Curated annotation (Swiss-Prot):
Subcellular location: Cytoplasm
Entry's family note: Belongs to the class-III pyridoxal-phosphate-dependent aminotransferase family. HemL subfamily.
Location, primary (coarse class): cytoplasm
Cofactor list: pyridoxal 5'-phosphate
Keyword RNA-binding on entry: no
Organism: Polynucleobacter asymbioticus (strain DSM 18221 / CIP 109841 / QLW-P1DMWA-1)
Keyword vocabulary terms for this entry: Cytoplasm, Isomerase, Porphyrin biosynthesis, Pyridoxal phosphate
Protein name: Glutamate-1-semialdehyde 2,1-aminomutase
Length: 434
């Protein structure tokens, strides 16, 4: 009797008690097909599945594991913190240290509030912006994903590009009333004329503009300088709050986040992923004038039992210490660029239309002639080619994001030898796409 693949066994078992067999939709392999890999352990740039097959990981928990899986320094910090307790439900000195560190690294953040997920961070930031301005309308952009808060599930990116019909001016998810999203205006990313027109018409009603300063949930899309300048100028002119959702880009693309590369000073910033070192941890912060509206000082309520728990704080503090070391981001950026160059050269040899882009330890590749700059352009890339490439690389032991609409991530553990294995696997795979 042939032994069944243990990933299949676990997936079948999972579907009996977990909806779809996964706890986050993109993990289900719906866009690429096949059986999700169930992970048993990870170390450095690698993880092992239920069959004990080793893969080079190019999602790194969707960004947080910038120092590599099971980094010994982070593990030691977590173990030490766990010896005292997992959670107190009361303030700790560690929370202060982490807040001070974040404020020092991201100058636009004068005060910061810890939460447990990126969704909590963006949801709370929007509530705060509305409370501060006494306005209801918010602007988001097509293909940008800001978590699964109801008012933000309109033409959203990430798994929603796979699972929902996002071409309609309606909620991208069931269970979200049309009435609730009527206060959410959705505009094309990188469209200066659209943002100018909306502010001219409704500027005095707009509480906030929220965006990914480098979009990573419709693959990787960079904003134009003109687009960012228009956003900053118009929000300042009309008294709206500019919110940078740096849950993905914060401490991932640069020590000061995307805003430090772009020269833009947002009013509020949302952080997550890297700042927790892989633990459930996020935050939102910004101008003291705005943050002072939060309870217990102001009338904008936000709370969380596990917010700022000591184990997550310890992981975050140690991770931020590691990424603050001299040369960290220069090395990370160089390695990511080297990987993208290798993939591009491999595709060119096989005559495959293929475009690449990267910033810091974040990258995107597209089966297209050029790097897209809009949501619409991303949806027109060759998704079928991506699906085939994904499985060819998976067979070679390289784990890519299981969706053409997600960015990829490297870590400081992805050294030259690891990169060469990836490039060799790609050079073997590309000819099979012709």
């Amino acid at each position: 009797m042939t032994k069944r693949d243990q990933n299949e066994v676990l997936f079948e078992r999972a579907q009996k008690t977990i909806p779809g067999g996964v706890n986050s939709p993109v993990r289900a392999f719906r866009q690429v097909g096949g059986t999700p890999r169930f992970i048993s352990k990870a170390k450095g740039p690698y993880f092992w599945d239920a069959e004990n097959k080793r893969y080079i990981d190019l999602i790194m928990s969707w960004g947080p594991m910038i120092a590599g899986h099971a980094n010994p320094e982070v593990v030691e910090a977590v173990q030490k913190a766990a010896e005292t307790s997992f959670s107190y439900g009361a303030p700790t000195e560690g929370e202060i240290e982490l807040a001070e560190r974040i404020c020092a690294l991201v100058p636009s953040i004068e005060q910061v509030r810890m939460v447990s997920s990126g969704t909590e961070a963006t949801m709370s930031a929007l509530r705060l912006a509305r409370g501060y301005t006494n306005r209801d309308l918010i602007i988001k952009f097509e293909g940008c994903y800001h978590g699964h808060a109801d008012s933000l599930l309109v033409k959203a990116g990430s798994g929603l590009l796979t699972f929902a019909d996002s071409t309609q001016n309606a909620p991208s998810s069931g269970g979200v009333p049309q009435d609730l999203v009527k206060h959410t205006l959705v505009l094309p990313y990188n469209d200066v004329e659209a943002i100018e027109a909306v502010f001219k018409k409704q500027g005095n009603e707009i509480a906030a503009v929220i965006l990914e300063p480098i979009a990573g949930n419709m693959n990787l899309i960079k904003p134009s300088a003109e687009f960012l300048k228009a956003l900053r100028d118009l929000t300042s002119q009309y008294g709206s709050v500019l919110i940078y959702d740096e849950v993905m880009t914060g401490f991932r693309v640069a020590l000061g986040g995307a805003q430090s590369l772009q020269g833009i000073v947002p009013d509020l910033t949302c952080l997550g992923k890297v700042m927790g070192g892989g633990m459930p941890m996020a935050a939102f912060g910004g101008k003291k004038e705005i943050m002072s509206k939060l309870a217990p000082l102001g009338n904008v309520y936000q709370a969380g039992t596990l917010s700022g728990n000591p184990v997550a704080v310890a992981a975050g503090l140690k991770t931020l210490e590691i990424v603050s070391r001299a040369g960290f981001y220069e090395c990370l950026s160089a390695q990511t660029e080297k990987l993208m160059l290798g993939l591009k050269q491999g595709a060119d040899k096989s005559g495959i239309p293929f475009a690449v882009d990267s910033v810091g330890g974040m990258f995107g590749f597209y089966f297209a002639d050029a790097v897209p700059s809009t949501y619409e352009a991303v949806t027109k890339t060759n998704i079928d080619a991506f699906k085939k490439f994904f499985h060819l690389m998976l067979d070679e032991g390289v784990y890519l994001a299981p969706s053409a609409y997600e960015a990829g991530f490297t870590s400081i553990a992805h050294d030259d030898a690891v990169l060469q294995v990836i490039i060799d696997a790609a050079e073997k795979s590309f000819p099979q796409l012709r």
